[in-house]
Amino acid sequence: KELTISFSRDGVITGVRTAIDNNSYLSILRGGKSNLDTRMRREILKFVEDFRSYYVEKNATALEEIFSDDALIITGRVIKTMGKSQTDGISQQVRERVVYSKQSKQQYINNLKALFRSSEFVNVDFSDIELMRHGSNPNFYGVRLRQKWASQRYNGNQYADDGYVFLLWDFTDETQPKIHVRTWTPRRSGQEGDHSAPEDF
């Protein structure tokens, strides 16, 4: 892992975070199909890295500040159960079911606080990051990414999932951008990614 160091305009260190891997970072800066300038890409990537670190650091206060008060938040959990195989009716087979939940900002933050208090660690990795600008609102940006989540509670219970997150960021105030939408969908075999776009919300 590499570190990123953030500085204020006065040269004071304001943050030290683990970074996304260098290949992903350079790929995003080059731009691909998106219409974002390099400066804005750097700004968005900095906030995406900070956002990921807030989960790892179990920093509910920072997460609370980054979501707008009326944010649309859709979370999901993968529930695994054992059941008999439909083929032979005898052998055991793991079945997965996804449970979605639409939450207000306060519900989401309260649930995170409870999770953080009861968890020994939370590991979150972001990859396959894609940036896009809203078609009609130049201050809104969509970020699609793959998220791998792993956590372990103090009682030993573990949870892990692999899915896609879409974030709709409002950069009207570039020093304090707000997330208006956060959605999660599970990664399916053969799936390339989430197809959400800023104009969907």
Descriptions of predicted regions:
Residues K58-Q86:
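Short, well-ordered alpha-helical segments enriched in acidic and aromatic residues
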Residues G11-E57, T61, E65:
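Short, low-complexity N-terminal intrinsically disordered segments enriched in polar/charged residues
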Residues E2-V12, I20, G156-K178:
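A short, surface-exposed beta-strand/turn
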Residues R52-V56, S68-L72, N110-F121:
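Sec-exported extracytoplasmic/periplasmic mature domains
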Residues K1-S8, T87-Y159:
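Surface-exposed, charged secondary-structure patches
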Residues I13-G15, V124-F126, I179:
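Hydrophobic residues on conserved beta-strands that form the core of alpha/beta folds
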Residues L29-S34, T81-R97:
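A solvent-exposed, charged loop/short amphipathic helix patch at secondary-structure junctions
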Residues V16-S27, K148-S151, H180-E199:
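Short, solvent-exposed aromatic-acidic interface loops
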